[in-house]
């Protein structure tokens, strides 16, 4: 049986799925929630079992929250969006997966959202020089904080949807206080607070 968990932060609803089912079991579940015809071709192109399960879990979460009449599609940039002939004012979405967890964030229409989660903080620690300046690294006291910065920058990248946006230099961690990370985007003249 699928494991769902929901979290609401302000006007963003996040649904989580712990991957325990096979792809066949998940396809069967999805077919009870929505018409799978629009998904068949793309699904057949996914080779790895784990990736198939992640892909299906994201769609199950979307249809659980939004009903059968929606379809997950992608902008040219790769950012997912919801489409429907019948339903108006569909939420914005962002999708992430790591380890055995899949999450989909839903926000009100025209209020973009970005989400990321990572199961392995040691990987972020090993590659920290690729996405954090020396100054940023001094601000982040341990591997958990470095992981938070990685997730924040990934989520911001998804949120901004700007091809070529660089993690190093164009997204700058300013401070980490009480579980909130402040990240500046100097070229865009923006500042983002990440929970």
Residue locations for each model-derived region?
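Core catalytic alpha/beta fold that binds nucleotide/phospho-ligands
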Residues: 1-195
């Amino acid at each position: 049986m699928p494991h769902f968990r929901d979290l609401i932060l302000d006007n963003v609803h996040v649904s989580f799925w712990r991957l325990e089912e096979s792809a066949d079991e998940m396809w069967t579940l999805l077919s009870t929630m929505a018409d799978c015809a629009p998904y068949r071709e793309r699904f057949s192109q996914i080779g790895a079992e784990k990736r198939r399960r992640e892909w299906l879990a994201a769609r199950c979460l979307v249809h659980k929250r939004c009903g059968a009449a929606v379809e997950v599609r992608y902008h040219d940039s790769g950012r997912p969006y919801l489409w429907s002939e019948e339903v108006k004012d569909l939420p914005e979405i962002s999708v992430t997966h790591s380890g055995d967890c899949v999450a989909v964030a839903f926000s009100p229409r025209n209020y973009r959202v970005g989400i990321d989660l990572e199961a392995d903080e040691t990987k972020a620690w090993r590659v920290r020089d690729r996405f954090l300046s020396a100054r940023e690294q001094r601000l982040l006291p341990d591997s958990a904080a470095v992981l938070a910065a990685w997730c924040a920058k990934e989520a911001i990248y998804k949120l901004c949807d700007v091809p070529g946006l660089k993690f190093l230099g164009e997204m700058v961690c300013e401070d980490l206080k009480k579980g909130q990370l402040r990240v500046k985007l100097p070229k865009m003249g923006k500042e983002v607070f990440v929970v």
